[in-house]
Structures are given as structure tokens and as C-alpha cells.
Amino acid sequence: MEFLAGDALNGRGSGTRDEWIAASYVAAQMRRLGLEPLGDDGGYVQKVTTERAELTSAPVLTIGGRRFTHGKEIYANPGAARVVGRLETWAPGAVIQPGAAVLLPDPAPEDFTPPQGALVLSPRPSIIKERWSTFLARPARVAPRLLKTQHSPPSVVFLDPDAYAVAASAARGDTITLQAEAKPAVPSYTWNAVGRLRGEPGKGVILLSAHIDHLGNRTDPPGGSGDQIFNGADDDASGAVAVLELMEALTHGSRPKHTIVFALFGSEETGGTGSRFFAEKPVVPLTDILANLQFEMLGRPDGKLPPQTLWLTGYERSTLGPELARRGARLVQDPHPEQKFFERSDNFEFARRGVVAHTVSSYGLHADYHTPADEIGGIDFAHMTTAIRSMLEPVRSLANSEFVPQWLPGKKP
């Protein structure tokens, strides 16, 4: 934790040299423990080539001649410098095509999966509503795009009440545009670290993962803070440490029946690029992966839960969470379903491809999220240690059992 979340790594910005250093550090731990390398050229690190266009102006959303600007009325996560779609209103069971502009109801549905290339117009969820001015202060960035992919990532735009009212009054089929000035796209890179603890031949795979990147540093941190480094101790050095600690424990003792793959992904903060690459070009067949557990923000307790308790996104969607709890994990249902955390971490790249994949967390919506104040001093190590330790034997048991997690009827993304 001291190394990953220390100032020396400058906040482990997505796709930066500091992220590469973090991936190399994880690779060194994998090598020390004797894991089988699954990275490039016989090593543990995967170098993922992407292309990214740097924006030179704030994105502007145009609806029926009305213009709304990032940083004023909207907060945009663009998947490309220019995105155009015809307006559709989401409804249960609706089939949304790539390239559509989708208006979500207020509150936004929990089971909506944005297709690649779509333009999603959303009301503000509570976590953004409560800190709207802080979010508006952030510059917009185009998500990196994997090479040789057909569509860009979805573009998600959060609207203030006035902008949302204009969108809601627009007619179905109206053209909606999100556009910004941008430099020509140039190659960029991100890095994953991947190793395997091989199990018995013919058995399945358990994927344990976290993300190693964070927000880097900025010369204009929110709130006028003099601290320019976004250390990301909770988000997600805590999850990376959880995977490293489980890796340390699971490599000792007898070989598991099922293979365990440990993956630390890059560029989660810019659209899940590292995990998307892994899912599109898996080092093990996705059909062999029985379960994916992503570890995200476990460094502080959630005040809604008993002490030293973790929660699982999408707990009610599959048989995995209840089974882990039955085997001793201090694991309960996500107490923040309105935040749609199931869809907001690397697990979702696997879940939408059919893998039973969830995120383990204890994030209680603390105010230090995505600010320079997310530092090691805020980590509750007693909580983190007990909670992670409670996952060890259930994960070990899962890796040695015949239990196969399943999606519950109608709950698969």
C-alpha cells in the first residue's frame, strides 16, 4: 500500500509511466511467488495498445438547437470526440442499438447495459448530485479505444435538471450530438499484470482482479487544495493489495483443483481499457472462467454495514455471493443499488460476456472519492485486514469445490 499509493507514483495515472511501474511491481510479486506468466514475451505484463484523441475544448451536447457544455450544465464521459445518435427512450426490454442516443428515466434503471458506441443521456445519480460542482470542475477526456474494434466505448452524459428537461421534451428520432474539438488520435498504451496458479487439467478458472491505475496528478485540484496528487489509496490501491495478499496466501499449500488467474488491470478509470482488452483477447478461454471477483475500494468500512463487512455488487444476480457468504466470507448485498456499482468496475466487461463476475467492496460513498484526500492516512487497516482475511478460505474452498456459480433467471446482463 505504501508503494502503490505513495507520492512517488504520482497517482498511477491511467496509461502513464507510473501505471507501468505499478504493473511492473505487481509482476515482480508474481515472479517471486512462482506464478506462471501470462503476459507478453514470457513475462507477466501485457502492453495494451490503444488510440486516444486529446480534447482541446469542452464537449458540447446539442439537443434541438439547445447547447449544453461540459463543466456547466452537463458532465460528459465521451467515447469519441464526436458522437451522433437518434434519440430513443429506454424502456424495460427495449433493444438499444449501437449508435443510438438513449435517454434514461429518472431515476436511471439498475439493469441498463449501454451498448458500445451509444450516447447515453442520464439524470444525475446521487453521488454526482451531491458533489456536482466537484465533478463539473474535472476536464473531459476521451476514453482510449482498443485498436481493431468496431465501436468506441459508450459515451455517458450526466445532465442537470434543465438539460434533462430539454432532452425529455425532445421527440423520438431527433438527432443528438456530443462534440468537442480534438487533436488527431495518437497511439497510447496501458498495462495489465497477469499470472496463473495452475490447477488440475480439465478444471475451470477463478479470476481474481483489481485495477492498478488512478487519476494521476493535476495542477488544478478541486476545492483549491494544494495537493496535486490523486494517490488513490482506497481507489484502488486497496483492491490491488487485496489481490496481492490473496495471491500470497493461495500460492502456499497444495495446488488448487481449479486454476486461479490473478489480473491487475490498467486504465479502469478511463473506461476499463485493460479489462476490455483481457476480455476481448483472453489468455484463458472465457468459457473456462467459473467466476470473476474484482476487488475495489476495501480500505474503509461502509457505515451502512456492520464493522469489517464487505458487500458484493449484483449479489442478487447470481449464486456466487450467497455461496461465498455460506463458506464464511463477511459478504452481504450491495447497500447502494442506486449507484449501479455492478456496471462501474472491471467485472462488467466479463459479466456482459456471460461470466459470473462481481465486485467486492466496502465503499461507503466517502467524500474523498476521486480527490487528493484519498490517501493512506484514511485507510482503516484493521477493517481491511479482517475483511480480506474473511475472503481467503471461501475463495480457496471455491477453487477446490465442484460448485459452479450460475446467473439467476433473468439476472444475466
What is the role of each PLM region?
Residues 248, 367-413:
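His/Asp/Glu-rich mid-to-C-terminal helical/loop segments that flank catalytic regions of hydrolases
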Residues 10-110, 315:
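Noncatalytic luminal/extracellular "stalk/propeptide" segments of secretory-pathway proteins
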Residues 1-17, 33, 37-42, 47, ...:
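N-terminal capping segment at the start of a domain
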Residues 64-96, 138-232, 245-248, 252-257, ...:
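Soluble metallo-hydrolase cores and metallopeptidase-like ectodomains found primarily
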Residues 7-17, 32, 47-49, 75, ...:
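Second-shell loop/turn segments in exported
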Residues 3, 17-32, 43, 162-166, ...:
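Extracytoplasmic/secreted proteins, especially bacterial periplasmic and envelope-associated proteins
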Residues 2-5, 39, 103, 118-122, ...:
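Structural recognition of the beta-strand scaffold that forms the well-ordered cores
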Residues 69, 164, 255, 265-368:
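Metal-dependent peptidase/peptidase-like ectodomains
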